[in-house]
């Protein structure tokens, strides 16, 4: 939808437009990040920023304190986004690492599926802490190989977003993982979760990127095998 929307909007943009993406994902066939899609569809004529972080809309809408990162290769663009969105309830930090911010926002959904599977199988806090920490190491390795900064993955847009997505019942990806852990099939899980389970699609992209770059990602590979190779959850857990 991002590509189609950007394509339709491109002829309407004024020369002084700043493009901001709040969508978290990787395009399935091309493995492009959202800002790269915007750049393609608008001819690279506009500055682009990504706004990302642990920001479930349910809580933002209620005015609960929230923090995000505005990332752009253009410091002026990042500062403009910060100024536009920040208030006493919504803190915005800036970063030049749009690659790391976008990758961490997209790939953490795969880890949320894994944590949900743990919940569904009855595992508790120790197991999830182990899973989240080691999975973040995997994301760091892939992110660095793709041009991101390791420090970004340990910050608000990385570890912060990972924590909220892996622990909140607002998270569709975690809810989907719980159903898988309880023994539901992939088809049943996607139907019952409601809405788009981003981690389902991100798992395929992550698997392909890991193979292409030669990065070992055993935890994320297990999620991929459950989703796309029908590997039993109980077998993977062993």
Segment roles from a protein language model:
Residues 1-65, 81:
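Rossmann-like NAD(P)(H) cofactor-binding subdomain of soluble oxidoreductases
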Residues 2, 27, 31, 35, ...:
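Generic structural signal for well-ordered, non-membrane alpha-helical segments
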Residues 5, 12, 37-47, 65-152:
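Internal alpha-helical scaffold of NAD(P)-dependent oxidoreductase catalytic cores
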Residues 21, 46-52, 92-96, 154-155, ...:
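General beta-strand structural signal in soluble alpha/beta enzymes
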Residues 24-26, 52-56, 74, 96-100, ...:
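Glycine-rich beta-alpha junction loops
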Residues 50, 71, 226:
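Active-site-adjacent beta-strand anchor residues
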Residues 108, 115-119, 123, 144-154, ...:
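NAD(P)-dependent Rossmann-like dehydrogenase/reductase catalytic/cofactor-binding core
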């Amino acid at each position: 939808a991002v590509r189609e929307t950007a394509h339709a909007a491109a002829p309407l943009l004024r020369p002084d437009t700043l493009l901001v993406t709040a969508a978290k994902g990787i395009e399935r066939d091309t493995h492009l990040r959202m800002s790269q899609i915007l750049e393609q569809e608008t001819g690279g004529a506009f500055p682009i920023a990504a706004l990302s972080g642990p920001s479930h809309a349910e809580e933002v809408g209620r005015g609960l304190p929230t923090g995000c990162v505005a990332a752009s290769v253009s410091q002026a663009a990042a500062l403009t986004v910060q100024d536009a969105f920040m208030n006493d309830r919504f803190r915005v930090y800036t970063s030049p690492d749009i690659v790391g911010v976008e990758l961490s926002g997209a790939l953490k959904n795969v880890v949320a599926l894994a944590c949900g599977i743990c919940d569904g199988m009855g595992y508790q806090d120790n197991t999830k802490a182990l899973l989240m920490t080691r999975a973040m190491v995997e994301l760091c390795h892939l992110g660095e190989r793709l041009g991101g900064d390791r420090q970004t993955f340990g910050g608000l847009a990385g570890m912060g977003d990972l924590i909220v997505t892996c622990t909140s019942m607002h998270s569709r990806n975690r809810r989907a993982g719980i159903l898988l852990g309880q023994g539901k099939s992939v088809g049943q899980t996607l139907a019952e979760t409601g809405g788009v389970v981003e981690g389902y699609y991100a798992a395929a992209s992550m698997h392909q990127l890991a193979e292409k770059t030669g990065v070992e990602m055993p935890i994320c590979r297990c999620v991929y095998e459950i989703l796309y190779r029908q590997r039993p959850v109980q077998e993977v857990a062993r």
